[in-house]
Amino acid sequence: MQSGVREQQLSDPFLQKEVIMSGLEIEDQIVGDGDEAAAGHAVEVHYTGWLTDGTKFDSSHDRNQTFSFKLGGGQVIAGWDQGVAGMKIGGSRKLTIPAELGYGERGAGGVIPPGATLVFKVELIGLS
C-alpha cells in the first residue's frame, strides 16, 4: 500500500473511501476475497476511464480485453500504481486521480485535456 497518512471517510457502511496525501481518492466498491496486489506483482484488470464531466475516454470492456501491467513499475500513470495496490482479486475500486498523478499539464493523445482529473473504475481480475 501507499505509505503516508491516509484519511478515511465512511459515508456508507459498505463503501470505504480513502484520500491519500497525494490527492488520490480511492473508493472500494467491492472488496475482493482473493490475493492482494502489491508492488512487483503483474496485475490483470478491467477498467473504464472518464473525465470529470462524464465523458468516457477509454474502456477495456469495449475491447473485451483485460489490461496487464507490473504494479509499482512505472508502466502506468502514478494514480494507477498507487490506487491498484492493496486491491484483492475480485475487487472493484473507483479511483479519482488528480492531474499530477495522471497525465499532468501535457494531457494525452488529444483525448485527455491538460490538467484533467480522471475517474476510473478498476476491477482486479488476476495477479501473478
Regions of interest found by a model, annotated:
Residues M1-S128:
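Cross-family detector of peptidyl-prolyl cis-trans isomerase
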